[in-house]
Amino acid sequence: MSGNTLGLLFTVTTFGESHGPAIGAVVDGCPPGMTLSEADIQADLDRRKPGTSRHVTQRKEEDKVEILSGVFEGKTTGAPIGLLIRNTDQRSQDYGDILQTFRPGHADYAYHYKYGFRDPRGGGRSSARLTAPVVAAAAIAKKWLKEHYGTEFYGYMGQLGEIEVPFQDKKHIAENPFFAANSEIIPQLEGYMDELRKAGDSCGARIEVRASNVPIGLGEPLFDKLDADIAHAMMGINAVKGVEIGAGFKSVSQRGSVHGDDLHPDGFASNNSGGTLGGISSGQELRVAIAIKPTSSIMTPKHSVDIKGQPITVQTKGRHDPCVGIRATPIAEAMLALVLMDHALRHRAQCGDVELAVPPIPASRPGSQLD
Amino acid sequence: MSGNTLGLLFTVTTFGESHGPAIGAVVDGCPPGMTLSEADIQADLDRRKPGTSRHVTQRKEEDKVEILSGVFEGKTTGAPIGLLIRNTDQRSQDYGDILQTFRPGHADYAYHYKYGFRDPRGGGRSSARLTAPVVAAAAIAKKWLKEHYGTEFYGYMGQLGEIEVPFQDKKHIAENPFFAANSEIIPQLEGYMDELRKAGDSCGARIEVRASNVPIGLGEPLFDKLDADIAHAMMGINAVKGVEIGAGFKSVSQRGSVHGDDLHPDGFASNNSGGTLGGISSGQELRVAIAIKPTSSIMTPKHSVDIKGQPITVQTKGRHDPCVGIRATPIAEAMLALVLMDHALRHRAQCGDVELAVPPIPASRPGSQLD
Amino acid sequence: MSGNTLGLLFTVTTFGESHGPAIGAVVDGCPPGMTLSEADIQADLDRRKPGTSRHVTQRKEEDKVEILSGVFEGKTTGAPIGLLIRNTDQRSQDYGDILQTFRPGHADYAYHYKYGFRDPRGGGRSSARLTAPVVAAAAIAKKWLKEHYGTEFYGYMGQLGEIEVPFQDKKHIAENPFFAANSEIIPQLEGYMDELRKAGDSCGARIEVRASNVPIGLGEPLFDKLDADIAHAMMGINAVKGVEIGAGFKSVSQRGSVHGDDLHPDGFASNNSGGTLGGISSGQELRVAIAIKPTSSIMTPKHSVDIKGQPITVQTKGRHDPCVGIRATPIAEAMLALVLMDHALRHRAQCGDVELAVPPIPASRPGSQLD
Amino acid sequence: MSGNTLGLLFTVTTFGESHGPAIGAVVDGCPPGMTLSEADIQADLDRRKPGTSRHVTQRKEEDKVEILSGVFEGKTTGAPIGLLIRNTDQRSQDYGDILQTFRPGHADYAYHYKYGFRDPRGGGRSSARLTAPVVAAAAIAKKWLKEHYGTEFYGYMGQLGEIEVPFQDKKHIAENPFFAANSEIIPQLEGYMDELRKAGDSCGARIEVRASNVPIGLGEPLFDKLDADIAHAMMGINAVKGVEIGAGFKSVSQRGSVHGDDLHPDGFASNNSGGTLGGISSGQELRVAIAIKPTSSIMTPKHSVDIKGQPITVQTKGRHDPCVGIRATPIAEAMLALVLMDHALRHRAQCGDVELAVPPIPASRPGSQLD
């Protein structure tokens, strides 16, 4: 199937461009009988939407979702769920210049040579705006996983540019525009962003995502390991340059005697695995981290060439996100939810329905989740 | 399609277990008319095979591949290519004990609860032995990519446990059992491995993979970005816990003014992107890094439980790899080749045949590849 | 991928229900650079739309399509093409009764037991209205195939109930509401339909579809033969109960000496194969026939049961098609076009781009097409 | 996925050529825990194998299957099941001549122009020999369906050339080499075949296939209707030119008042639908018919051309099947079983596990199956 569909059984097919009339998704394979309304979806969309603080793009989009199909009298019918979000704040008058140039770090160059030309309006299909339908689709997955397994998702910023953001408490995440699980570091982050904006520059971010109450047994050997499909989904988010599961790159310098998570009758003693063993969920908390590169659209002039290969200087004007990572947390959660949902269905196809298989030992040990 | 098939158009479906009668793969979608013989495949298999140095598993396997189909008078016909490798050194007499226990860090626990029971002989399906058919299949992809685009692959060890392995020269890679691109560090690596083995412990590794002469335009928005499919393939390799493209996690603390690779009439000035822009190959060298966790089978006793949840102590006896990362380089190359091959076919399906589209500017600038 | 997507590379994912707010499709994998506007699509939609004669459903739908994405400055960009058709004539007030009963021959019974309940409004997802997005999507495929290979499609009614409709001339097809390639039989067909309507009954139809200038080489052994994928697509149309390629069921009683189409330097002498050999297009005219069952919604009372299994009598009131086959011709053409388009892309993925491979002998011989 | 894989969740990937070293299949997605041995598979293979009567090809093949993987201690593990059948009776010495010519009705012409050349040995990939791995794979599906739902399959010859073969009793099918459910017609069929062989000609056949105890609810709207996937699978069998479900082409001339199967508290009153409603199984007996064309390899000379387009005469020498339809019954059963198995898993993925959902009314009424 083509590149705009995610998943094998719970599939999300998106369409739309940044400055076209609308964006949206078709969600197929949703189990029937689940209550669903626009309100269930809107909450997550609102967490992602632009313009919520001065640190992100000032584009004004309500991101109001319309369910076009797949729901009857408030319940999913098993038919595909059409989701539509109209674009309202397109400003595409003056892209003519952009069409002739390649902005360093942007998709321009690759799109141009792949397709022969490109839609330059706000990045077209390569815009981060296209994560909105993904977040909308994932809200459906989250609801089902919550109802069936009690699965819960949360994400938070682990690092903003050079500043590490220590995890204090989950409750802080919703209290600030950075999705920081930390109540004291916000002024420092705000100062950092203001300085960046003044310098006409941008920075990257590290986002952490977690899922708890994940059923044991999700993921398929060999190629479609749960972590492999998570890596695929995460690396599919705009600007992501790295993905880690559990100890990630730290495991390179760990000894085996340290890395392997001991098992005790009351659960795993640690979580270096990040919740997967042999590519299959172990019931422990799933732990994923992603690296997001600094925004390419900056006010600082950069060397580039035009489509004829002639040297030019490129400098972004107008609104932009100095750190796309700030709004990435709900997107990363969404991707994780979509992968789990797809694998929950794949698992019950092959192995039958299970309501969170509970082994003689609990999957997690008190206090083992945050080592 | 189920989890044992990789790719959409150039598909590799593997089968087999560590200690079953045979392992193998069916490679479908190969373009017709390419000369192919067992010899083309055997070379890569030999680079991966066990028992080549004292630092890896001492299992004796010839890994001799037989082509069962898809080739007529030395040429691929377009029909699926069946590849068969007989297992010869199975020692599965005494697995009874293993069946009752979960080895920390192993797939045992997850397989047991997913499938209800498991094949314990040498790890069954979760054994790293199953990378052999992948390497065999990828040899076909490499050959085609080389003939069509001049694409070349190489990988090397970037770090062994705590020891960084500086890149000196590609030519050294084949001169030592570590795939180190460095001629001086070998004694240090050997000493480190000997010490680990004495300590009954294991370590992780960081592997770097590169592809040059990659056509511009490979990769599909949105979900099947080239880097997304690379991440999927790499995370599907046993023991991989992290994947990076280009600057990877370093991009978190980079400024946009630094990260974005400038373009000049003679090529890109740097390669922080790792060869993809917007998920599409830019023609620059592809750069991927993976983190491999330390081997779970160690001589050091670990706490665990048996399948009834009772506490036990687990200690591996007999042959094992103290660092599975040592043999991972050809496997990582193989995965990269399979992803590129699949996307080369996907690209020409949608956009027509191209023989390495050459833009007015060359994709790489003299000296820009190793910054 | 789930059941609402057709195709591997040129994929059509539809959504919507008969009486929901909208129906539509996402068309992914379209080659870039083709001029496309709503007008290109509307023509085929208009041929399919209801209410065009007194012999079909009187539902009033404009079936006006909106392109939501994938086109920039009048050209396809390679991004997914979102197509939206708003429903305007929904009359869903009084379905309460239908929800409790199973109409004989309808999907009610199967949907109810598959999903646990169903959307009863106008048949919900099982309505023939859902062929509109398919026709819209196929208009894109037809345009591309025409431009690249000169491929042309036409279909016609071969039989209406008990009345065979002899083929006279292609030009007549557009001159009557039955898609009959015959100018003299129309009064007889009209009389037959009027009589049926008076009797409160319905009838089936046999539709013939043809494609000419089909490139040689489309179709993939083993399972995805061109004819296999055509059969899949055709049998996916509502009410279709049979599919034939070429001589079809007549080939059962043919001798091999008669059935096998002789080859001469000026082309094939006959076309019993229907344009495929070994599941691959031979360049001859593609010939497909489908059987459409009589409409299940009839004014004649039928025995049935309610959802509790109690006996009831079911009798349709209000508007309905006495022969859904009358409007099926453009739908069958659409399905054929989608399959050819998908296989055209699949072929050039594996075998490279070909502009209608021309063998030393022409694929068709003068006069051989209509034997 | 490429064309040599059937199914979405229960996937069968075949490889091999008629005269290569081996043929085989990888069966992926099989539920774990089912007992399975070669003996379970061999029985169906033996029903299909050549050389069992004087009316079929005299090629001597034992068709002995080896299970290479996916089974541990006699039970399926959930890992892919590798199946291998060595070819033993290849006679490929003198194909040189065939390579230069196109045999009318054969795949030669299409393969040649698709791939640029072809494997001529016994038809290569296009040989009916490749149905052996399909039959082997389907034996696994049949076993699982039988154990879970009590599903049973049988097929029989409905017509041989011009001779209709009336259905008398299922028990006769295994008593004659024609799979005729009729004990009296056998001498007539044998005489017909002897005459054909003397005439150097061949004939077609009509095969009927049935499945009973099919769970309600299998099949997916819109495109992957159960009947659509059945049509795809059946048309994928060599030499099949037509597929019917239930009343098939007879439904064209049926009135709606006759065609629609009445429902009564004790079941359906008839079975014109053939066991599907809206593309979803209704629990009634599944009824499929296929048309098989006469064998193309005949002793009668036919006009053709060589690969340079020059006129030639083609005449088959040596062993051949004068009616490939004679051995097609177990193949058609196999295809039906594979489709049902795949949809059984797809259904429980989306809708949860069901052990043959039993509605308040039974799916079939006493005596309704053979109307």
Curated annotation (Swiss-Prot), chains A, B, C, D:
Catalysed reaction equations from the record: 5-O-(1-carboxyvinyl)-3-phosphoshikimate = chorismate + phosphate
Assembly mode: Homotetramer.
Function statement: This reaction introduces a second double bond into the aromatic ring system.
GO CC, alphabetical: cytosol
Annotated keywords: Amino-acid biosynthesis, Aromatic amino acid biosynthesis, FAD, Flavoprotein, FMN, Lyase, NADP
Gene3D superfamilies in the cross-refs: Chorismate synthase AroC
Cofactor section: FMNH2
Gene Ontology BP, a term: aromatic amino acid family biosynthetic process
Cofactor descriptive note: Reduced FMN (FMNH(2)).
Keyword Flavoprotein annotated: yes
Pfam name, any one: Chorismate_synt
Enzyme class, first EC level, given as a word: lyase
Binding site for FMN: 125-127, 238-239, 278, 293-297, 319
CDD domains xref list: Chorismate_synthase
UniProt-recorded Gene Ontology molecular function terms: chorismate synthase activity; FMN binding
Listed pathway(s): Metabolic intermediate biosynthesis; chorismate biosynthesis; chorismate from D-erythrose 4-phosphate and phosphoenolpyruvate: step 7/7
EC number(s) per entry: 4.2.3.5
UniProt binding sites for NADP(+): 48, 54
Identification of the protein by name: Chorismate synthase
Family classification: Belongs to the chorismate synthase family.
